């Protein structure tokens, strides 16, 4: 008899294969054992650190080939952990001062760090805790002489089952053999979930108990569309899911026919579908999925996973590469959006109680122009290689925009005096992610060239609800009428001044939100490249006039639930 296990759908698709249990190695040791040869124990610890660096470098290089530099940057962070004196020194001191064995010293110190990071109401720091756990486990395995599981050695068709997959586990998965995976813990934003989407393999996380309910070699189905795992399916279930898998692949193939199609409603209104990217390595997916531009080019990758600022030349090459590849299509580059939630040793950013409301993004750039000016110079120099738009993140006041624009114009003049060619067709815009900015959209619209609505932050700032907090996640409501009214206000203000508005938050690619946004008059929908073809098919089947009527009714609703019901009645 088959068994159904429910989890969180982390990556689309259907996988059918036998289970491969990722068995946790025995990393137990005598915590109370004292050592007499202190120097020898320190040397043992140092040797484990070096061996871990060698392994992680190999994994990092493999991840860059399979997943791109953006995802491989996780392992740059792991390597930095192994070089962090604030972590390494206390471990060595514990061995020397307390005669602790290397395994005890390592686990005691890293557990303290993990506990501190996990207690913070900050998703980035919680991810740092996961990084330290992963690195600590690798170092401990070398101290104890125990081999960690190596998913790269799998040479037959399997679905991996485990408590969790660490970033290094996921980076070693071979798509040829690993059909999918399912884990006890994790969420859609965990490292393993993000990487599974990059690898395009079905994944389900957060099942809570799958390792207790599945045996090695069981046949299992991973339904990444609905979050279901079926263990030892019946013949009928097997046939049904084989059909479902074939339909999924057929649908993907059918969607490819829309790659070069226009995005136009049944009543002839055009919309622009653009892609969000994190590095130039994301370009193949952008082109493959028929993006009509790039609506958000995040530039943080240039600053992460390193111990010094990127040079102007490094930045110039990264911007030039994307502009050339897009061949005249619009590329919207967001200037540095970073703050105290990210640990960059060379920036010496202050620790803050709430870094998401603190010294970050445009605030940091205006205050530390030695960071801002090289980025603007690199962007201006790259502007002649394509259609460049520049937008400033987290702008709260018109004076912030004016100051940023003045600095950019100053650097433009400097570059021209140095003999550089600069495009005269660069549009300057802002991210609308703060309610105050949306409230003054009519004021901003007179001075900016465009708006890009960042719904992820706009929603949590408007509803005062941390989207990463389980306790208040019910308040993170993309379809709340208050959000729809703000979006409408921004779009109408831009159109009144002959400007355009895009959206680059998750809402832009959401199938419930798309009819509403179309009706509100959104000009550009920017989303994950893998969502573009589905969105194109959806928009091409909608009537702009009908969606305008829908949107006008939606903004008069009282609750998110009413809005969803309204959309479902309009779009069947």
UniProtKB/Swiss-Prot annotation:
Enzyme Commission number: 2.7.3.9
Residues involved in phosphoenolpyruvate binding: 298, 334, 456-457, 467
Cofactor: Mg(2+)
Domain of life: Bacteria
Pfam annotation, one family: PEP-utilisers_N
Disulfide bridge partners, by residue number: none
Main location: cytoplasm
GO cellular component: cytoplasm
Localization per record: Cytoplasm
Gene3D superfamilies assigned to the protein according to its UniProt record, in alphabetical order: Phosphoenolpyruvate-binding domains, Phosphohistidine domain, PtsI, HPr-binding domain
Remarks, miscellaneous: The reaction takes place in three steps, mediated by a phosphocarrier histidine residue located on the surface of the central domain. The two first partial reactions are catalyzed at an active site located on the N-terminal domain, and the third partial reaction is catalyzed at an active site located on the C-terminal domain. For catalytic turnover, the central domain swivels from the concave surface of the N-terminal domain to that of the C-terminal domain.
Subunit structure of this chain's protein: Homodimer.
Protein name: Phosphoenolpyruvate-protein phosphotransferase
Species assigned in the record: Staphylococcus aureus (strain Mu50 / ATCC 700699)
